[in-house]
Amino acid sequence: MLTINSTIKKFIAIMISTMLLLAVYFSKESEAVENQIEFKEMVINGDVGHEDKKLIREVNPNYRNIQSWISSVGAAVAINDINGDGFSNDLCMVDPRFNNVTVQSLIGEYEKFQLESTTKQTIAPMGCVPADINEDGRQDIVVYYWGRSPLAFIQKETSDPLSSESFQPKEIVENIEMYSNTLTFSDIDGDGHLDMVVGNYFPDASEVLNKNSVKKPLMQDSMSQALNGGTNRIYLWSEDQGDYLYKDVSSQVPDELLNGWTLGIGVADLNKDGLPDIYAANDFGPDRLLLNKSQPGNIDFTSLTGKKDWKTPRSEILGLDSFKGMGVEFVDLNRDGWLDILVSNIAEEYALMESHFAFINTGEWEQAEKGIAPFENQSVELGLNKSSWGWDIKSGDFNNDGKNEVIQATGFIRGEKEKWHELQELATINDELLKYPNSWPKFIPGTDISGKTENAFFIQNTKGRYGNYSDVFGSSEKKVGRGIAIADVNGDGLLDFALANQWDQSSFYLNKSKVTGNFIGVDIAYSTYLNQDSLKIKEGKDSTKKRHAVGASLEVYLPNNEILLAEVDGGSGHSGKRSHEIHFGIGDIKKKKYPARIKWRDVNGVLQEKNIEVTPGWQTIWLPMEKGEK
């Protein structure tokens, strides 16, 4: 017995020493980088002259003792080319202080204006997504809400300069009382048209924002396995829907996607079969990954989960996790030609000590036949596991050095009275009581839970590990962030971004970095108005009316054997929506042309692939409208 105890003690001592050495090593590694990325911060939603601003929502009486918790979402931002000048310099944002949706030019091309807003206090916009849903070559805007179904604002033919009169509100689905926190577009069934995926939070008809309601809506029924949330929905584009543009096919959705408390939805082709797969980031329960096997008009998904092994806790296995999923991002972090998945959770250094995820795609997709998701969480090894209370997460190469940075919006409720300890107690409550709001601590105005943290900006060092350099945000005032939108606003090859803050002013960050590398930038669109029958590449930006090829992918092959991969994004994430362009930083590599392969679905739904060459700088790839070349 003494020998066993002695052996155990030695083993424990060795393990502790090893962990301490690793901690020192990792901390040194994360510091070994010189930050040369600089931004100029500009406020995009000032409150001067607005006496009607609010800092809390009116809520259902059953939620009054957790009013600040219920009021913690709604700030959102999107950057895109809405006015069709060829540059993604238009910004759409939701400001919960005024319960409105506004559109503005980041370069002053037109006056800031408000989209027609609801006058009902029981309805609140949660985000806006630019998309050409009627396929006329002009960007429309789809707004999603708490309290109703998504509503489209269709851009009219004569809309120069842009104004509120440029958009016509249109119901595109049957209007019901639903509570959406995220929405994205992609061609789910492969028919050549954009479909809509909506992530919902509260159950339908909960009357969350009705201060006079007699209903008694509930909260989650578990902190780790909650399945009593809102019903997520998939809407397919349809020509025969009468008054509506989209058909609700949610009855065909697997149960795994349906009723989590969803805060983030991501859609991308993870296995390279030409169909976009779905990742749902769920609060209070396991995230979900659905492998897409759909055919035109008929959706078909298979749920995948990560493989269990001795070194990975169940709480960090894809599809089995118990963390608080907030945002999701697809990026090929290791440049091996496979899209990886970044996920925001709650990852403070204390209290609810969870972890963010960096699921690295192994490319072993034959495992999917056994229901296994071929991903390994490497957030700890990469240094991406900790920051704060995470929301939107986005990635891009902001100094074009060939290594992607990662931005994360963080923070929960800002106030004067620290309530972390009460939240910690709530996390241990019996699940049978958790769903009843009156059993919760009081989270009312004045509450502070992770309200004084800094948004995260992760930069990778030469050893491959990331360190958090939040000083790039500039402002000394700490705010709680929600949505992030990335775009090259002025076409200089440097990525800029906007960050929407909850109950506060939000900011746009213009990239002013001086030490930068080379880049490849590509705008992929259908040649709706060029009448061409083959793929063509035009140097630079192009203001010709275009229908962006959402879901199209581009692989670029570098002489150092790295493979660059990205897709045209249709709105993945939490409440931030990036522009439709693809951007790669390539460091100091200098060649006139780079071999590449583009994959897309033509407007008839036929999957196309073509070997091409791309050049440094911006270029526009015009896709043929009919069946293209291989």
Q: What role is predicted for each listed range?
A:
Residues 38-55, 65-69, 113-123, 168-179, ...:
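Short loop/turn motifs that recur once per blade in beta-propeller domains
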Residues 73-84, 124-135, 154, 180-194, ...:
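Beta-propeller blade termini
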Residues 90-95, 140-145, 196-200, 277-282, ...:
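Hydrophobic beta-strand segments that make up the repeating blades of beta-propeller
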Residues 201-227, 344-351, 412-449, 530-539:
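Short, conserved, GDST-rich strand-edge loop motifs in beta-rich repeat architectures
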